[in-house]
Amino acid sequence: MLQKKKINYPLQQIARIKTGVYCNPSNTGNAWYLQAADLQADGCLSRGLKPTLHLEGKLQDRLLKKNDVLFMAKGVNNLALAYDPKTYGALIPSTAFLIISNSNTGVLPGYIAWYINQPPAQQYLKAQAKGSSPPSITVKTLGELEIYIPDIETQKTILKVHDLRTREKQLKSDIEHLKEKILNYQLSKAIRK
């Protein structure tokens, strides 16, 4: 029986990597200027982002596109997020981010983000980070990260299981929050008697 050989590819062979852009945000606009504080520790974008940029001229070219992956290049939380225009709307990332533009149909953007967020990839990136306050990951370093690419069905299965686990954790958190509210209500009621 032949065993499949496990092949890793440098990310730069799979996708194009570019930096975010520096802009002066305003109080109004028709696009969101994504800054470091907008990415939460769980890898999700903050809720309630407000449009702070007017899309004009060269800024149009900097809009995130479907299949792009956002990567937090500066700071200690070097997380990746697959961009979905239906969920997040028009976004232009700041220089705190690297953008992984994936045009390879054999690799799902969600899989790239999931792989980057796994402990072995995170350990590699942290070991290669430049500077100390805050540390940052360069385009070159991210491009050299080797990624194992299974078949598309395996990628879909991984993402489905990951999504289910994430949902399970959220439900457990919600249940704990509700239990806390019930207990506090009952204790407050007991002392009022």
Where is each model-derived feature located?
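A structural connector/turn signal
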Residues: 58-59, 87, 132
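Short, surface-exposed loop/turn microsegments at beta-strand edges and helix-strand junctions
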Residues: 25-31, 62-64, 83-95
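Non-catalytic DNA-recognition/assembly elements of restriction-modification systems
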Residues: 1-29, 149-193
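A short beta-sheet element
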Residues: 73-114
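Basic, amphipathic alpha-helical recognition segments used for DNA target recognition
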Residues: 11, 98-148
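Compositionally biased, charged N-terminal/linker segments
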Residues: 26-42
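Generic structural signal for buried aliphatic residues
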Residues: 68-71
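Sequence-specific dsDNA recognition surfaces
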Residues: 8-23, 39-66
